[in-house]
Amino acid sequence: MPAGAEAKNLPLVVLPHGGPAARDAPGFDWWSQALASRGYAVLQPNFRGSDGFGRTFLEAGHGEWGKKMQTDLSDGVRDLAAKGLIDPERVCIVGASYGGYAALAGATIDTGVYRCAVSVAGPSDLKRMLATNKRERGVGALRYWSRFMGVDGIRDPDLALISPAAMADKTAIPVMLIHGKDDVVVAYEQSTIMADALRAAGKPVELVTLDGEDHWLSRSETRLKMLQSTVAFLEKHNPPTTPSPAAAP
């Protein structure tokens, strides 16, 4: 929550974690604190498929990429809106790695919830992601990701239905893509593919390339550049304060 703000009709940033077999826990988080300091409430949901809540909860995410793992996020938005805590017309989604995928899926698959999306090192073409993992990490990696995505390997036609790049024409909101050029976890091309798909569909997109940076944004100067780019994009497309109504004549 923004310091000193009344918990009512706040602008919201949904910040899903990466992994997806990971979790958010109470404690200092530099990214959410940076956003809260700019006036945004921040929601960090532990959606199904997150780790640390037992095997059943983890496996509940299998086959739910772009599906229930995604609607867990938008259900959180609807719950906060129903309680009057946030303004449902002022919500954006921001995330890195799997969270970046979720941000792109919020723009292309589970649409109508967000005003803008920021993906940091997020996969967009899942068929290519599987092929890259098989080539670089072996068949075990292919099986792991296929099981989590709920697909039958690289040739499964359902991959297109959960790949944001294949659904780029469904986008109705501005998208920012941020990616380290030297990322060896999620290849930089995953963001260029998404940027090309959005441009081909005539959709608004910005691509921020972090030269010499890895998947985790290990260098402080590029981490700062990511934050500055994200905040500027959010303030442009989802201002943290609503304009005052014009005075009556």
Short names for language-model regions:
Residues 9, 29, 38, 171-172:
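Short loop/turn elements that form and flank the Walker-type P-loop nucleotide-binding site
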Residues 45-249:
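Active-site-proximal cap/loop segments of hydrolase catalytic domains
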Residues 15, 27-30, 109, 193:
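Alpha-helical transmission elements in cytosolic ATPase-linked domains
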Residues 23-26, 189:
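Short N-terminal helix/helix-N-cap motif within the alpha/beta-hydrolase-1
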Residues 26-45:
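Short amphipathic alpha-helix adjacent to the substrate-entry channel of hydrolases
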Residues 1-8, 163-168:
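Short beta-strand-to-loop junctions in surface cap/lid or active-site-entrance loops
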Residues 8-18:
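Short beta-strand element of the alpha/beta-hydrolase
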Residues 11-12, 41, 116:
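Short, Asp-centered acidic motifs that coordinate Mg2+ and/or phosphate
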